[in-house]
Design a protein with these regions (language model features):
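A beta-strand edge to alpha-helix "cap/lid" segment located at domain peripheries
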Residues: 2-29, 36-139
């Protein structure tokens, strides 16, 4: 099982490498190409199926500046042919001033022909820590 966790984590790192390089060919390699997959980019509605997801990555890559992407705090769970990875994304435009954007992400991979392929990606902004500490979210 440790070997499968390592392979799933490698697939996750390949996804973030493709994202950082804004390389659509590498991104295509990371994903399953079925109709049963989904992606939710920060601030977007859910996209279903490879056609929609592929179009979204092409638009994002065409309309964005070069950036650095770091994936931190990876936690992986593997069960059968599914792997779930939780992580923190830090995205920073090259040459930009200020703090990088911080996203919390959940990535789900399915084993297809001995390779881990992404079937779900969901990223959303991290909550403001100071504001969330002031709120009483548990009653």
């Amino acid at each position: 099982m440790d070997d499968e966790i390592s392979r799933a984590l490698e697939a996750n790192r390949n996804f973030y490498a493709a994202l950082e390089r804004r390389n659509i060919g590498e991104m295509e390699e990371c994903w399953s190409h079925g109709d049963d997959i989904a992606c939710t980019h920060p601030g977007w509605h859910r996209l279903d199926g490879w056609d929609e997801i592929s179009r979204s990555w092409r638009a994002i890559f065409a309309n964005s500046r070069a950036w650095r992407v770091r994936c931190e705090g990876e936690r992986a769970l593997v069960s059968g042919d599914l792997a779930v990875i939780f992580c923190l994304e830090k995205l920073e435009a090259v040459g930009a001033q200020g703090e990088p954007a911080r996203m919390q992400a959940t990535n789900v991979f399915r084993k297809e022909s001995e390779a881990w392929k992404m079937v779900h990606h969901h990223a959303s902004p991290m909550p403001d820590v100071e504001a969330s500490e002031e709120e009483d979210t548990v009653n």
